[in-house]
Structures are given as C-alpha cells and as structure tokens.
Amino acid sequence: MQLTPQEKDKLLIFTAALLAERRKGRGLKLNYPEAIAYISAAILEGARDGQTVAELMSYGTTLLTRDDVMEGIPEMVHDVQVEATFPDGTKLVTVHNPIR
C-alpha cells in the first residue's frame, strides 16, 4: 500500500486518537499528545461528514473538559490546528482554547 505523507499523518492521528478514546473510556486522564490527537481526529471526521469550518471550530471546544485531562494540560493547549479535507477542498480548522 502506497500512502502519501499526509495520509500517513492522518493514520497516525487516528491511531493515537483511538488509544486516547479507549483510555478516556476507562476513566484515565489524557496527556498532551492524547488530547491533541482526540480533538484532531474528531475535526478530521467532522470534515469528512460534511460539517463546516465554523461548526467544527465550535464542536472542537465541546470534546474535552478539564476533568478529562491531566493537570496543566488545558493551560498548555491554546490552539489546535488541523488541515482537514472538505468537499470543496482542504482548509485549516483552528480551535481556540479547546479544553474548558
């Protein structure tokens, strides 16, 4: 199977997000890479499902709370930026202060 670097990146994000989802489901608090992957994968999937950039920017702030992540993580994550593929092309989605 031949994958482009972008496709490899998306698979890596998905794999990390799947791990984060499982850990979150077991009641574990997510660390920095897990939190970023969890939010990023949700944005990528939302774009694939046809949501708009504005919808995804709003949705990204509802995915994780302070209780879902380790201490200090919300202060470390100011923005999450994801280059997502929409029906009309690739766009950059920025979620400001995603962990509230």
UniProtKB/Swiss-Prot annotation:
It is found in: Cytoplasm. It catalyses: urea + 2 H2O + H(+) = hydrogencarbonate + 2 NH4(+). The keyword Manganese does not apply. InterPro entries: Urease_gamma, Urease_gamma/gamma-beta_su, Urease_gamma_sf, Urease_subunit. One of its GO terms (cellular component) is cytoplasm. Pfam families: Urease_gamma. Pathway: Nitrogen metabolism; urea degradation; CO(2) and NH(3) from urea (urease route): step 1/1. CDD domains: Urease_gamma. Keywords: Cytoplasm, Hydrolase. It comes from the Bacteria. Its EC number is 3.5.1.5. The keyword Cytoplasm applies. One of its GO terms (molecular function) is nickel cation binding. One of its GO terms (biological process) is urea catabolic process. PANTHER family: UREASE. Heterotrimer of UreA (gamma), UreB (beta) and UreC (alpha) subunits. Three heterotrimers associate to form the active enzyme. Belongs to the urease gamma subunit family. This is Urease subunit gamma. It comes from Nostoc punctiforme (strain ATCC 29133 / PCC 73102). The lineage of its organism: Bacteria, Bacillati, Cyanobacteriota, Cyanophyceae, Nostocales.
